[in-house]
């Protein structure tokens, strides 16, 4: 089983965790070209393009200016991203075996690097899927990557057993020809909902935390079968068979009234 996670907007340049080995991103050349094009934008342009405040725009202007410099810090992707999902995944106590298993059974989406393995070494950046770079065919990052990633992604899923546990956000489907993905491999999408006033509600922060916790559960337990996911429980979230089907695994917190 292969797990797919979304990249995070926040990144770190240092980590106390030491990975057992580093690998080169498979789309390093494309990432370098994208970063080069992004380095042409001014701070004001980045602020508008990335829909961020001035402080974040300045930070990422500096990142892109230094992206190709030899001294620019880099980290394995699993340690570089610092969003809620990755805080909950929490690889601080990962053994060498855990990292090696993750390398084969976890993939991270990236608008800059395309598709990453956990130990692929990356540099800090920020990018959105709807950014259009004229020098790269005047298309969005979603369109740019779709033709490049789909075959590689399907091959990765097949090598991991032919089953995809999709824990990425919905927008990340647009990085791939998702109809082909669903046709050629089995896709299971866990959902996390909270009972509120007798109705199911989706709370973004709980969804992100649960995605990180479930990924940790899968990697630590070497879960290779969708049925293994049904044993996941965290902070009251448990598998709800009555709301689930073969493609959608629903986990709820609490009971309906």
Task: For each feature predicted by the language model, list its residue ranges.
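Internal, well-folded beta-alpha domain core
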Residues: 91-245, 250-257
């Amino acid at each position: 089983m292969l797990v797919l996670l979304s990249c995070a907007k926040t990144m770190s340049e240092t980590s106390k965790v030491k990975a057992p080995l580093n690998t080169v991103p498979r789309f390093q050349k494309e990432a370098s070209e994208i970063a080069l094009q992004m380095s042409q934008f001014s701070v004001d342009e980045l602020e508008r393009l990335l829909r961020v405040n001035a402080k974040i725009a300045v930070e990422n202007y500096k990142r892109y200016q230094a992206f190709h410099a030899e001294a620019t810090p880099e980290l394995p992707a699993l340690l570089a991203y610092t969003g809620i999902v990755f805080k909950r995944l929490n690889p601080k106590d990962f053994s060498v075996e855990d990292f090696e298993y993750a390398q084969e059974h976890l993939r991270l989406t990236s608008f800059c690097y395309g598709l990453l393995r956990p130990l692929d070494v990356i540099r800090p950046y920020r990018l959105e899927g709807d950014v259009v770079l004229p020098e790269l065919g005047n298309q969005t990052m979603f369109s740019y990557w779709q033709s490049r990633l789909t075959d590689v992604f399907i091959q990765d899923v097949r090598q991991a057993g032919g089953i995809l546990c999709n824990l990425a956000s919905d927008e990340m489907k647009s990085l791939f020809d998702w109809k082909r993905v669903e046709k050629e491999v089995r896709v299971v999408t866990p959902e996390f909902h909270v009972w509120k006033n007798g109705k199911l509600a989706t709370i973004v922060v709980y969804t992100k935390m649960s995605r990180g916790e479930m990924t940790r559960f899968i990697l630590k337990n070497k879960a290779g079968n969708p049925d293994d996911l049904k044993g996941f429980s965290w902070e009251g979230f448990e598998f709800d068979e009555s709301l689930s089907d073969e493609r959608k695994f629903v986990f709820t917190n609490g009971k309906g009234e």
